[in-house]
């Protein structure tokens, strides 16, 4: 029997506590957060204040409550005093949760919107990279082309040098040949009459002019 009586007492106490809490919540539902000056000082505090109603009696009650709050002594039960703090905590938590819920949505939207412009520009860059890769591949596939061009340049330079040396050799040889011919002609002219000498000299002059 003692166990049942204890249970009944706890149930009745719980019901009373629930009623008190519900009454405190109903009172606090109509409160607002406002900036309130503290007494005669210029300090202002942002805290919960009961909503003013048009009725005269309620206005007087609210004025009394406002004076008590300005003095720093709130005429409320511990449950009522704790309930505004709980409401503040709930509001702050709800605001933070709403911000936290909104921030991932914004991040998702930004992540969804950001890849769209990034997909378009890589097309030309891929083309240029492909061209560069093709050029490198061509250079790797045909390494002998550059070597062949270098060999051709070296051969052409060698041919030019050989031609110039041959020309230089031919000029003194031609001069020596002309000198030998003139000496031979002069030797022949010694035993030839003067008329033939004149003809030979004229022919030599013509050959030299040519």
UniProtKB/Swiss-Prot annotation:
Keyword Nucleotide-binding found: no
The encoding gene: Bcl7a
Pfam families named in the record: BCL_N
Name the UniProt record assigns to this protein: B-cell CLL/lymphoma 7 protein family member A
InterPro entries hit by this protein: BCL7
Region of interest called Disordered, as start-end residue ranges on this chain: 48-210
GO terms for biological process, alphabetical: chromatin remodeling; motor behavior; negative regulation of cell differentiation; neuron projection arborization; positive regulation of cell population proliferation; positive regulation of double-strand break repair; positive regulation of stem cell population maintenance; regulation of G0 to G1 transition
Ranges of Basic and acidic residues composition bias in the record: 54-72, 128-145
Compositional bias ranges of the Low complexity kind: 151-165
Lineage top rank: taxon: Eukaryota
Chain positions found as Phosphoserine: 203, 207
Keywords: Isopeptide bond, Phosphoprotein, Ubl conjugation
Biased composition (Polar residues): 74-84, 94-117
Family stated for the protein in its record: Belongs to the BCL7 family.
One GO term describing the cellular component: chromatin
Ubl conjugation among keywords: yes
Cross-link named Glycyl lysine isopeptide (Lys-Gly) (interchain with G-Cter in SUMO2), sites: 199
């Amino acid at each position: 029997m003692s166990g049942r009586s204890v249970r009944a007492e706890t149930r009745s106490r719980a019901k009373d506590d629930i009623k008190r809490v519900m009454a405190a919540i109903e009172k606090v539902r109509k409160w607002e957060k406002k900036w309130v000056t503290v007494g005669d000082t210029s300090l202002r505090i942002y805290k919960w204040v009961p909503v003013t109603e048009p009725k005269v009696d309620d206005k007087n009650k609210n004025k009394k409550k406002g004076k008590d709050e300005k003095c720093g002594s709130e005429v409320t039960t511990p449950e009522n005093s704790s309930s505004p703090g709980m409401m503040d905590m709930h509001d702050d938590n709800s605001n933070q949760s709403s911000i936290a819920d909104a921030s991932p949505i914004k991040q998702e939207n930004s992540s969804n919107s950001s890849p769209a412009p990034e997909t378009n520009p890589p097309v030309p860059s891929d083309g240029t990279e492909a061209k560069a890769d093709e050029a490198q591949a061509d250079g790797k596939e045909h390494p002998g082309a550059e070597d062949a061009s270098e060999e051709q340049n070296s051969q052409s330079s060698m041919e030019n040098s050989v031609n110039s040396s041959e020309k230089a050799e031919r000029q003194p040889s031609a001069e020596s040949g002309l000198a030998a011919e003139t000496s031979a002609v002069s030797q022949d002219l010694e035993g030839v009459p003067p008329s033939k000498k004149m003809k030979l000299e004229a022919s030599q002059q013509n050959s030299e002019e040519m």
